[in-house]
Structure formats: C-alpha cells, structure tokens
Amino acid sequence: MIVPKDLLIPIFNREIFKGTDRFEVYEGWRDEIPLFSGTYSDCRMRVDSIGKQEYRSLMPEAGEIPGYLDLNQKVIQASGMIDPDMLSGYRERFGKIVDDDEPFRRNVRFYYDTNSLMNNYFFLFREYIPDFTRRASHNTSLGVVSELEDIFDRKLKGHFFPDHFKDVYGKDDEIFHSQPNLYGRSARLAYSEIEYLKKELRVNILTDDGVGDRIILSSFAHDSQKLNLDGVLVTNDHIMAERAGMRMGSWLVRFDLSNVKGLNTRLEYFMEAVYRAAIIYGRVRVNHDIVVSGLWSRKRQEDWNSGHIMVEGCSDRDLERTLSIMSRVPEDFYGKGYYS
C-alpha cells in the first residue's frame, strides 16, 4: 500500500514542516536529534538521514519505505513504544493457551480499560498473535475484542462450555452495573454492546474512572486468587498495570500509549488515533469510531494546539473543537482505509 504523505506525517511522532516535503521522526518527544528524517516524492518517502547508528538496520537499503504498516512497525520498534521483554511472556503464555485442547476461556478473563486508545492494541495483537485477522466493528474498542473473539471461536468450535464456566462469567454484570459513572466512551460501549460482550465474549468491561480503578484491580485480584482465573488487564494506565502486577501473580498486558499521566491526552496523540482509525477502520466519525470528549486544560480558545483533551465527559464546545480538528483529515480518507 502506498500511503499519501499527508497521512504519514501526523500518524507518528513528527513535526509538520509546512510548505516543504521534509519529515522527521523522533525517538522521544523532547529529543533534539531525530531518529531519522527524509523527504517525500509524490506518495513515497525516502530516508536521507539516520540520527542513531543502531537504528540503521531498521531501514531498507534503498531508503524507501513503501507502506504504512511497514513504517508503523519500524517506528514502534525503533522508538521503544513496545518493550520486547514485556511481550515475551505474554506471547508465550497466549501461545500455550490457544494450543490447549481444553476450553481455555475457563481459565482466562480479559479486563478491558475502556478508556484506553484501543487502536494501538490492534497493532500489538496483529503483530504478536498468529492467526489474527481484523473484523469490522463500529467501535474502536470492539474492533480489538472482535479479533479476540474470532480467535476464540475458531479454537473453541466443538467444545462444550461447562455450567460452572457460565456461572463464573455470569457474575460480571454485578461488577459492571455497580459503576455509577459510566459515560463518554464507556457508556457508548456499554449500553450498545454490553449484552453481546457479557454473554458471547465473556469479557469483563469495566471503567477506570475513579472508583473503577479499584473495582478492576479488586476484581482482577479476586478472580486470580479465589477463582483460580488468569487475568489479562488491557490498559494504557501504567499505574494500574504496576499495581496489578504487585498485587497478584497473574499475567497482564500493559500498553502505555504515552508518558502523560492520568487521562490527559496530548493533542498529538489524539491526532494519531484519528489518522490510524482512518486507515484501520476505513472511516472516521467523531464520537462513534473514536469517542472523543472532555475538557480542555487551557481556557484560551486560540491556544488549543498546546492544550490537552481529557477523555471524560463531553460538551458542545469540545465537540466543535473536535470537528475542527477532524477538518484537517483529508477528505480522501473518509470511507477508505487499508482494509476497505
């Protein structure tokens, strides 16, 4: 796939050089020396400078990077967004589960932090889990869940689910409905798909809004210790991941999208999610494919470029700003994508 240059620039951690055809990719947000840089020629890009020798092997000899997925993986590998040591145990454990003749979901429960930007998990699963194909979904979070469901269904055909297995997962709604603060992304996901997720996928859908942190972690610990269930905590909240790792011996998946603490999401990360959705899902609809809402940390309207988006609640003014940001997405990307 040849990706237009207008899309490649905002997808990763780059500076946009207006009026030129140059690009730079940095390893860290505050690095002075770019990881690599280059120029565009039509819809292709050429690397002409690599700042660090150890990353030179990541680039093709000819210097051309032909497609989005190829570039995405190289940038992720180079920038350290995915720690191989963190994934090795997960990949090995997951492989053992899917190769087991027994119905493995009786021992595994997924705990989803629904405020996470699930687009990033898609790349993780696609890269590290064999037999992983994307199935279209109208929600970014559900897109990943659907992938896992596909794997489960293929492995579990012909298997019988014991009654005690259903009893265990039937209790999820008690935990879920004790949440007093379901709104925004969580509410949209919950109220549109909760029955499907609970009954068909047997997935814990919990929020991480305030009290949700404790509910996820306590549920994670209880199931691991009392019910002998292995838990997979899917979150981009490093604090939750660290607490979960300290409190029980179960395994988990941790995926930090950024080094920004809490729910504050830099505008650059939001733009990255928007553009990734344009490719992955073939369309971008505000508050639908990507649920964006919240308060801006700066009051000056003209200073939005240096503000934050808080994924928490929504107002008309925030939606207007979101639509303004969305107007930057070239029209060619609407209704199209890598999988379209």
PLM feature spans:
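Feature 3881 marks metal-assisted phosphotransfer/nuclease machinery
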Residues: 1-112, 116-231, 239-340
